[in-house]
From Swiss-Prot:
Pathway: Amino-acid biosynthesis; L-tryptophan biosynthesis; L-tryptophan from chorismate: step 5/5. Its cofactor is pyridoxal 5'-phosphate. This is Tryptophan synthase beta chain. It comes from Blochmanniella pennsylvanica (strain BPEN). HAMAP family: Trp_synth_beta.
Length: 396
């Protein structure tokens, strides 16, 4: 059988206990066979179009760029059913789970967006669902926890370590190693052991495909730059994929600068990490000189992750994608600006990408340029977080 490439340059691989190799091999084989299965592809397309709501619009921000020569477009993944880009790939993985005769789904979630998306797919396709979530994230994402529970999902709090996404990932992987015969581990980002980074990228590729067609329809040309936030990296790799081979389009990934990348409180694994083995892959990790994984930090739960998908490390090393960071205050400011001027409340994760786009425009307001920001999710889940952060600023 044809095999997928398990490495991106030197990054990626399958660094897992021997017991999980058969499950990962089965998943790879199911994915490869599904690519040539017209019935599978027809079902996935039907669900994406008629259930999830694809294609999503490409929206021009007329107010935010007033007084400049720039055009700023938003790829509106926030309008997808479930509220974020996560729905794209969970529908694909859920169909793969059915194809492999699995009866249960287990997954991890940080911001809760992936957990909600998994719950949607499991509910739709009649699969049992368990979601592991750091207890800190449960507190800051109560709305998404309730949404998951409403759909019949068992949300399991993780009290280990920093009680955030990395600990939820570890716990979900641990559980999968015990139950893989009847469960499918639905990883939420383009990271982890092979074949997950490739599978997730391919299911998220629809974002870039649509953007490519839409921007040419509206502008009769390609954009100058595409900007996306990067935690694990699935929304970014999804929109980047159809533009990677077009050097005229600048690709910009935006990491969580937290309280500042010169502090210990950030999530910038690409800019300040070092190479190691983590979560079943060779990648860039925030780690100590002794190899201990450090705690990451971000005001946005979805970017609060100490590592990143291996393809992003490869794209950074080859120079094809430039990675920058935006701090909490800049992200919250962009969150407010989009809400006030365009009537769109973005996820805090997406607000990091928006903040960098606004920086580019502010630096050269007289430059005629076309920027596309992947608005990966909506911000309902973040309203109380932003409210609390603004309250703290006022109380200083």
């Amino acid at each position: 059988m044809i095999k997928l490439k398990s490495y991106f340059g030197e990054f990626g691989g399958m660094y897992v206990p021997q017991i999980l190799i058969p499950a990962l091999t089965q998943l790879e084989e199911a994915f490869i066979s599904a690519q040539d299965d017209a019935i599978f592809q027809k079902e996935l397309k039907y669900l994406l179009n008629n259930y999830a709501g694809r294609p999503t619009p490409l929206t021009l921000c007329r107010n935010l760029t007033k007084g400049t020569r720039a055009k700023l477009y938003l790829k509106r993944e926030d309008l997808l059913h479930g509220g974020s880009h996560k729905t794209n790939q969970v529908l694909g993985q859920a169909l793969l789970a059915k194809r492999m005769s699995k009866t249960e789904i287990i997954a991890e979630t940080g911001a809760g967006q992936h957990g909600v998306a998994v719950s949607i797919a499991a509910s739709l396709l009649g699969l049992k669902c368990r979601i592991y979530m750091g207890s800190k994230d449960i507190k800051r994402q109560k709305l998404n926890v309730l949404r998951m529970q409403l759909m019949g999902t068992q949300v399991i709090p993780v009290h280990r370590g920093s009680e955030t996404l990395k600990d939820a990932c570890n716990e979900a992987m641990r559980e999968w190693s015990k139950t893989y015969e009847y469960t499918h581990y639905m990883l939420g980002t383009a990271a982890g052991p092979h074949p997950f980074p490739t599978i997730v990228r391919e299911f998220q590729r629809i974002i870039g495909k649509e953007t490519y067609k839409q921007i040419q329809k509206y502008e009769q040309c390609l954009p100058d730059a595409i900007i996306a936030c990067v935690g694990g990296g699935s929304n970014a790799i999804g929109i980047f994929s159809d533009f990677v081979d077009i050097p005229s389009v600048q690709l910009l990934g935006v990491e969580a600068g937290g309280l500042g990348i010169n502090t210990e409180y950030h999530g910038a694994a690409l800019q300040h990490g070092s190479i190691g083995i983590y979560f079943g892959m060779k990648t860039s990790i925030l780690q100590s000189s002794e190899g201990q994984v450090k705690n990451s930090y971000s005001v946005s739960a979805g970017l609060d992750f100490p590592s990143v998908g291996p393809e992003h490390v490869y794209l950074k090393n080859t120079g094809r994608v430039q990675y920058v960071s935006i701090n909490d205050i800049e992200a919250i400011t962009a969150f407010k600006k989009l809400s006030i001027h365009e009537g769109i409340i973005p996820a805090l994760e997406s607000a990091h990408a928006l903040a960098h786009a606004l920086k580019i425009i502010q630096k050269q307001p007289d430059k005629a340029q076309i920027l596309v920001v992947n608005l990966s999710g909506r911000g309902d889940k973040d309203i109380s977080t932003v409210h609390n952060a603004l309250q703290k600023e006022r109380d200083k």
